[in-house]
């Protein structure tokens, strides 16, 4: 008792010694925001006020003083120039133009912005006496002021929208520390507007709730706090700012959110929930190192400190006492954030769990009782009193005794194979043991009948009995087996004993000849149950029939005993020989649909899984349950019938061709004409709303057996065939292909130029030739850096050849997938990364800024096409080409729809359509507009962010129709920002007129582009694909031919990479469909449609086709 009193007094003395160390720490002046935004125009007058920055005080006597950084910064923190244009009033925080920013200065800054458009610049504002370090700018002592840069003059006041007259582009948010003196933290007025538009009156007010600690002064329009804030009472204030604009007789009101967040300081002392400061810790069966024996909880109304501050702020000390206790136990600290309700709102708080943990294994003989004290100190606590608590753990370490039942009685079959498990022995409470090492042994009373073995299971400290010698089982005299079971604790050598009686049952039957050593080899039930294998208790393998539901844990397989194999765990007996249960124990390869086990074996499989242990392979394949439907005679009869039908078909075809050539009119074909023929059976059809077949316009238009086209020469674009050398095929479809080529003296250039040449195949129809001709006519008029460029054509004295720009890196989809292989390791380290990036800029690792730049370039090209009244119809990553310098080029406007991937397109009579990229109105109503291209652009954004991923993963295209109609949209991918995903969802609005136009999309991407510069984790969550466009030919093996397919000697380099076909859309699309179509909802639409609208109606799945597809899938 005296010792306890003395210990308590010592603890109180220690607490008193800690109190003087707990004092208040002044944090100094701080900004109410970490970023400010304003617009900046070229040729704004010197002296124009721009905005105020505000500082809040830590103490009433502090006086703020503001300083500007020396430089202006641009995209990716590029240092552009010394700040010669903007100044600040040191006492008020007013930023103003010191001199006008003219066009020459703007161009100088643009040149230094690494080739990116000069959209935003920023500078740094510092608070004195904070040290003015140009390279560092961290809140609260530094803030950034961003200026949206416009290379135009300030717009006319009458043209400004009310939102532009009232608030900046970016919504402000504020940070205010608790327990600080009240002060001004914002000024509503937009100073440039007030300075340049004095005739417009703007008034502001806050929609304040009753009793809120904020006010807006009506004369100065400054927002300030009324009194010191308390975060523990309320952490967030979601206010609303109201602006009223008076311009003549016009009055308009604009409202925006005005959020204020109260920042925490350590002003709440830790406490015990419900006053509990003592916990009991009983150590008995769980005696392993790292075992948690007791936990006490401490509550703190302050928020969880940052990980770097955690050790410094919260210290936990196991107070000196018994040396054995100091060596045996330790205290672990686990903080977790929680929420508590205060004044009708939720605020964050912290619960700290202090766990008493074993620092080492304890022997079963250890027997002690003690009390441990832990001192918890919130060292940053700034309130009255002390942030110190004392935790108490009452510890009892109990001894463990070993006991076995007096007798075990088991049975075993004479047919049992080696390693067959027949039962378990276990000391009392062994399944609860942890950290106790018990070993089991068997002592046989008869040497000639020693059949069994025992091994200790590490999982539950039991002993598993198994057949170790099958020869003894066959001896008639071994009808009963007698053993002594001995369990020994390895640390203390304490023992327990029991009698084991095993009855041998049945008679021995010899093994079938030709049976495998392992049951797992068998793939069918019949052969499985006819044989035995290692580990079989009955001498015969057992078949486990699966449930047949895809990849499942209950897969079909052959096992020695379904009680133990497979069970997802390779036990200590199964580890003796891989042939016992490879389904649980195999470390080799597994082929087919499966989920691997941890750390080995098969966790789940598809169909039937069988294994070949010697080859270290398992196979999971669909179950083969069907017998042959046709025997040898049946197959002979069918083959004869097929051969006879084929002969008859050949004879009839020859007769028809002879008649056709005999009676058909054959007009002469000159070298300037191209003639194509389409069989009558290939005419497309569409379906009415009732499901009846009807001929399409395209089919009626092509009922003429032969169409002839005269291609007129255009001297401006005609290129001599003799100067064009064709090379390797880059891509081909059913009717067209693209080859790499070299052109001599192209457009007046000296020497050879690498180009791509697009042409038709011999089986092309008049429709494909019309598409190629209209593409030719459109490309003559199109000229944009982000649209594939036309160089010329060969239209005379041979087939039509289009010569277009060559893209070095192929399709964007392939480029993105290749970038996955770069990974973080490609970035190198230190200076080597920067050197590599400078020497090979196109090979450096992708950043999020690069991906946004790709999307911005494509949006620029699509904006241009929209202004040209062109609709793409197939905007996707596979149809974007990547040229030198990572320049995006829009291509493939429709001709190459026959060559796409199976999972991207749905096959119809007219080819394949890109279901997963099509807008909802295109799928259901066959409407194709610029706004349907916006939908496709949203899917393209998803492809870019996922580095070439397949949209709607796991969803077949045929099932996508109803999912889209019911509002299904793809989820936000990893590495995708909220603002990028928000842009995707806007592109996928169901109503086309609610989607953004490409001009607005470009602006949104410009804003994102200047914010992001972080590297992507290309190794995370991305599959490793093989090279997509590799056909095995080297550069030297690429054949060269001229336009007449005559071989040429190789005199030029032939480096190439495969691409999809290039193409453009029809420039003469009518505004309305030539065939009136009725929407399902009965409304008429004003969107322009694709000219062959009735043809594309045939792309939709009919109800019967959809039902057939579902049946096939199932």
Swiss-Prot record:
UniProt-annotated location(s): Cell membrane; Endosome membrane
Effect of residue 620 to R: In MEN2A, MTC and HSCR1; familial and sporadic forms
Resulting phenotype, residue 972 to G: In HSCR1; familial form
Chain segments annotated as transmembrane: 636-657
InterPro entries tied to this protein: Cadherin-like_dom (IPR002126), Cadherin-like_sf (IPR015919), Kinase-like_dom_sf (IPR011009), Prot_kinase_dom (IPR000719), Protein_kinase_ATP_BS (IPR017441), Ret_CLD1 (IPR041163), Ret_CLD3 (IPR040667), RET_CLD4 (IPR041317)
Effect of residue 778 to I: In a patient with renal agenesis; uncertain significance; constitutively phosphorylated
Catalysed reactions listed for this entry: L-tyrosyl-[protein] + ATP = O-phospho-L-tyrosyl-[protein] + ADP + H(+)
Result of changing residue 1067 to S: In a patient with renal agenesis; uncertain significance; prevents phosphorylation in response to GDNF
Consequence of changing residue 730 to V: Confers resistance to vandetanib, cabozantinib and nintedanib inhibitors
Binding site for Ca(2+) 1: 178-179, 230, 232
Record flagged with keyword Oxidoreductase: no
Substitution effect: residue 609 to Y: In MTC, MEN2A and HSCR1; familial and sporadic forms
Binding-site residues, ATP: 730-738, 758
Protein family per UniProt: Belongs to the protein kinase superfamily. Tyr protein kinase family.
Protein name: Proto-oncogene tyrosine-protein kinase receptor Ret
Protein's gene: RET
């Amino acid at each position: 008792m005296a010792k306890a009193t003395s210990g308590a007094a010592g603890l109180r003395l220690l607490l008193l010694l800690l109190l003087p160390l707990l004092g208040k720490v002044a944090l100094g002046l701080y900004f109410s925001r970490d970023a400010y935004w304003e617009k900046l125009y070229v040729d704004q007058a010197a002296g124009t006020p721009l905005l105020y920055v505000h500082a809040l005080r830590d103490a009433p006597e502090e006086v703020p003083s503001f300083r500007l950084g020396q430089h202006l910064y641009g995209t990716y923190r590029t240092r552009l120039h010394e700040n010669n244009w903007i100044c600040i009033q040191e006492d008020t925080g007013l930023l103003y133009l010191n001199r006008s920013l003219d066009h020459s200065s703007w161009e100088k800054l643009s040149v230094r912005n690494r080739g990116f458009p000069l959209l935003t610049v920023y500078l740094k504002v510092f608070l004195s006496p904070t040290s003015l370090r140009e390279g560092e700018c961290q809140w609260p002592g530094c803030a950034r002021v961003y200026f949206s840069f416009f290379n135009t003059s300030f717009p006319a006041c009458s043209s400004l929208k009310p939102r532009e007259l009232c608030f900046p582009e970016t919504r402000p948010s504020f940070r205010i520390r608790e327990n600080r003196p009240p002060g001004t933290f914002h000024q509503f007025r937009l100073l440039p507007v007030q300075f340049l538009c004095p005739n417009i009156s703007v008034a502001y007010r806050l929609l304040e709730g009753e009793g809120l600690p904020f006010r807006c002064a009506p004369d100065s329009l400054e927002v300030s706090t009324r009194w010191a804030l308390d975060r523990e009472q309320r952490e967030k204030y979601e206010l609303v700012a109201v602006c009223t604009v008076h311009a003549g007789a016009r009055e308009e009101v604009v409202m925006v959110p005005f959020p204020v967040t109260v920042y925490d300081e350590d002003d709440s002392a830790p406490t015990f929930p419900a006053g509990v400061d003592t916990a009991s810790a009983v150590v008995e069966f769980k005696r392993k190192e790292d075992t948690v024996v007791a936990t006490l909880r401490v509550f703190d109304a302050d928020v969880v400190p940052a990980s770097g501050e955690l050790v410094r702020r919260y210290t936990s000390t196991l107070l000196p006492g018994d040396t054995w206790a100091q060596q045996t136990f330790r205290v672990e600290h686990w903080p977790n954030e929680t929420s508590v309700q205060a004044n009708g709102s939720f605020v964050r708080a912290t619960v700290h769990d202090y766990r008493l943990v074993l620092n080492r294994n304890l022997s079963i003989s250890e027997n002690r009782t003690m009390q441990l004290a832990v001192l918890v100190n919130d060292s940053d606590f700034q309130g009255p009193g002390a942030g110190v608590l004392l935790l108490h753990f009452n510890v009892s370490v109990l001894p463990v005794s070993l006991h076995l039942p007096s007798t075990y009685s088991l049975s075993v079959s004479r047919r049992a194979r080696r390693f067959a498990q027949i039962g378990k022995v276990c000391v009392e409470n062994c399944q609860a043991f942890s950290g106790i090492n018990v070993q089991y042994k068997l002592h046989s009373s008869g040497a000639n009948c020693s059949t069994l073995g025992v091994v200790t299971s590490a999982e539950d400290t039991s002993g598993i009995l198994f057949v170790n010698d099958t020869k003894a089982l066959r001896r008639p005299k071994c009808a009963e087996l007698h053993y002594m079971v001995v369990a020994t604790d390895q640390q203390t050598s304490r023992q327990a004993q029991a009698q084991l009686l095993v009855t041998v049952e049945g008679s021995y039957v010899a093994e079938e000849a030709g049976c495998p050593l392992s049951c797992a080899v068998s793939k069918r039930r019949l052969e499985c149950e006819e044989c035995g294998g290692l580990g079989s208790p009955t001498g015969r393998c057992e078949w486990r029939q699966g449930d047949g539901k895809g990849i499942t844990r209950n897969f079909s397989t052959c096992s020695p005993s379904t009680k133990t194999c497979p069970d997802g765990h390779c036990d200590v007996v199964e580890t003796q020989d891989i042939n016992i249960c490879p389904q649980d124990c195999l470390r080799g390869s597994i082929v087919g649909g499966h989920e691997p086990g941890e750390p080995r074996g098969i966790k789940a499989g598809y169909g039937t899984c069988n294994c070949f242990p010697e080859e270290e392979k398992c196979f999971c394949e669909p179950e083969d349950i069907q017998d042959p439907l046709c025997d040898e005679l049946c197959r002979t009869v069918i083959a004869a019938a097929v051969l006879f039908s084929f002969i008859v078909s050949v004879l009839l075809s020859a007769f028809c061709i002879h008649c056709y050539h005999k009676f058909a009119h054959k007009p002469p074909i000159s070298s300037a004409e191209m003639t194509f023929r389409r069989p009558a059976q290939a005419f497309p059809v569409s379906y009415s709303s009732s499901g009846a077949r009807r001929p399409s316009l395209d089919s009626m238009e092509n009922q003429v057996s032969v169409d002839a086209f005269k291609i007129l020469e255009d001297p401006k674009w005609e290129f001599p065939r003799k100067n064009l050398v064709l090379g390797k095929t880059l891509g081909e479809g059913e009717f067209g292909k693209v080859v790499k080529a070299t052109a001599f003296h192209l457009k007046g250039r000296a020497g050879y130029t690498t180009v791509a040449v697009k042409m038709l195949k011999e089986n092309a129809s008049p429709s494909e030739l019309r598409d190629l001709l209209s593409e030719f006519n459109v490309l003559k008029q199109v000229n944009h850096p982000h649209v594939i460029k036309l160089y010329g054509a060969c239209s005379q004295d041979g087939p039509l050849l289009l010569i277009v720009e060559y893209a070095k890196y192929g399709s964007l989809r392939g480029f993105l997938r290749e970038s996955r292989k770069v990974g973080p390791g490609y970035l190198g380290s230190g200076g080597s990364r920067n050197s590599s990036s400078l020497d090979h800029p196109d090979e450096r690792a992708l950043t999020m800024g690069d991906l946004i730049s790709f999307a911005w370039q494509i949006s620029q090209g699509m904006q241009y096409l929209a202004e040209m009244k062109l609709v793409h119809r197939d905007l996707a990553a596979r149809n974007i080409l990547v040229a030198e310098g990572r320049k995006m080029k829009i291509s493939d406007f429709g001709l190459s729809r026959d060559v796409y991937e199976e999972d991207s397109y749905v096959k119809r009579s007219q080819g394949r359509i890109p279901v997963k990229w099509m807008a909802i109105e295109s799928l259901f109503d066959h409407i194709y507009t610029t706004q349907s291209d916006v939908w496709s652009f949203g899917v393209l954004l998803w492809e870019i962010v996922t580095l070439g991923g397949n949209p709607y993963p796991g969803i077949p295209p045929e099932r996508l129709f109803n999912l889209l109609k019911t509002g299904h949209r793809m989820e936000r991918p990893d590495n995708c920002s909220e603002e990028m995903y928000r842009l995707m969802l806007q592109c996928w609005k169901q109503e086309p007129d609610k989607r953004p136009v490409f001009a607005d999309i470009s602006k949104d991407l410009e804003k994102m582009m200047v914010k992001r510069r972080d590297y992507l984790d290309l190794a995370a969550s991305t599959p490793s694909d093989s090279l997509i466009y590799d056909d095995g030919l080297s550069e030297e093996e690429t054949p060269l031919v001229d336009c007449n397919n005559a071989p040429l000697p190789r005199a030029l380099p032939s480096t190439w990479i495969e691409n999809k076909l290039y193409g453009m859309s029809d420039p003469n699309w009518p505004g309305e469909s030539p065939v009136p179509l009725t929407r399902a909802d009965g409304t008429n639409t004003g969107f322009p449609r694709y000219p062959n609208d009735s043809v594309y109606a045939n792309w939709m799945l009919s109800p019967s086709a959809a039902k057939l597809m579902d049946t096939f899938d199932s």
